[in-house]
Amino acid sequence: MGQCCTGGGKAVAGDEAEPGTSKAAPPSRGTSSKNGSAKQQPCSPAAKAAATEAAAAASSSKKPAGPIGEVLERPMEEVRTTYSIGKELGRGQFGVTHLCTHKATGEKLACKTIAKRKLANKEDVDDVRREVQIMHHLSGQPNIVDLRGAYEDKHNVHLVMELCAGGELFDRIIARGHYTERAAAALLRAIVGIVHTCHSMGVIHRDLKPENFLLLSKGDDAPLKATDFGLSVFFKEGEVFRDIVGSAYYIAPEVLKRKYGPEADIWSIGVMLYIFLAGVPPFWAESENAIFAAILRGQIDLASEPWPKISSGAKDLVRKMLNINPKERLTAFQVLNHPWIKEDGDAPDVPLDNVVLNRLKQFRAMNQFKKAALRIIAGCLSEEEIKGLKEMFKNIDKDNSGTITLEELKNGLAKQGTKFSDNEIEQLMEAADADGNGIIDYEEFVTATVHMNKMDREEHLYTAFQYFDKDNSGYITKEELEQALKEQGLYDANEIKDVITDADSNNDGRIDYSEFVAMMRKGSGCAEATNPKKKRRDLVL
């Protein structure tokens, strides 16, 4: 993500609000007064945002107005007139973030540049416009990244905002080496406070995750800042939204059902709390569809390690935030008043198990590398391999029902000579059964078995390794990893060192093929056959 998040993409695009309910109100432009400020319209948060934006535009330049930009709908202006653009800080689906310096004051800021050519349709344009409106609307709140200005030229939109030089939340937790429940409660208190502010100001974030919370500086007391409002929306009481947006682990069940409101943000924070305390997400799987199926089931594990060592108050809050019924879920205000989260509350000041930190580090640092490698492997599968899996499905589906039961799967895999333990087959079944109906249809089977197959095939792993090993030296260096992740749109400057360190078992500063294979197979069922609950805990996604 870098110093300033660069925006996420929608998993599935749909109508913003339920037909028959009001959509997020279009902003009403303020009427400019003589001094260039704008009169605020009292009707909506969007109007306030638009008025602030209009005022900024009116006062930003005294030169003749340029042509009107199609995204921000105001005169285009060159950002480099005011700022010097420096090194790259991060990269996302729609944009790149650079360090920038205000030419007059020397202040260091972050400039998020969004290429207009990547805004493929009106919805994408509306998203960027709304992001600017929302950030202006939330401007001045102490724990939200401050937008200093928005600029549009012929090719790009530039958002200039506070520079959060302290890095991501995960990085701070890991760097400290240990933390207590009380520290986790303080962290959650800050996050929920931010969301309470957003909700009270008529904004749903819709993409809450640890990566979207940054620290303003490297100081121990640096304030936490929420960022990346690219998926956020204005909302009114009772308004229902239907488009599926967000990041897989953190999406609320009602979002997947296309009928949700601000309660979805509380679910996402509940997932974050679970990760802060246990080091792994509560709902995991080998594919996005399987993650969604687990979320819809809503069964959270509060029995396996390290949960027996965690206080009853923490577990009570997790349950109430991850209540599958949004109407019964706590509000942000209620979370802030829970005994565990209060400043002088019940959270014990006892260090959490070190394994939690290790898991946090794995989940944070290895995610993008493994994701990139899996993408490469999936792309190198031949038609012949896919055809073989189709035939395998037919052979396992003995009653020709078009679906496979657990018993059919066990018998069929054994006859195919595939060496999986019962625990591994049950894991495969659960991961493959995306709709949670207890059986696997053809599409579910192919998706799941392609993954298990490719993890067990040396040639696929080697193909992926070669993709990263750009100079064919037999090693993946830091520079090669950076290049490959940039090509995949997964680059994060902050995590490269952690990725190398975690995979580099012989500590020579680079990753050889055996280390790459070990990293890829860790937690996949190929490296070790263990208790399924333990395997779940050690899985690196």
UniProtKB/Swiss-Prot annotation:
The keyword Calcium applies. ATP binds at residues 89-97, 112. Ca(2+) 1 binds at residues 397, 399, 401, 403, 408. A lipid is attached at residue 2 (N-myristoyl glycine). Its EC number is 2.7.11.1. Residues 38-67 have a biased composition (Low complexity). Residues 347-377 are annotated as: Autoinhibitory domain. It is an enzyme of class 2 (transferase). Residues 384-419, 420-455, 456-491, 493-526 form the EF-hand domain. Residues 1-11 have a biased composition (Gly residues). It comes from the Eukaryota. There are 3 contiguous domains conserved in the CDPK subfamily: a kinase domain, an autoinhibitory (junction) domain and a calmodulin-like domain. The autoinhibitory domain (347-377) inactivates kinase activity under calcium-free conditions. This is Calcium-dependent protein kinase 26. It comes from Oryza sativa subsp. japonica.
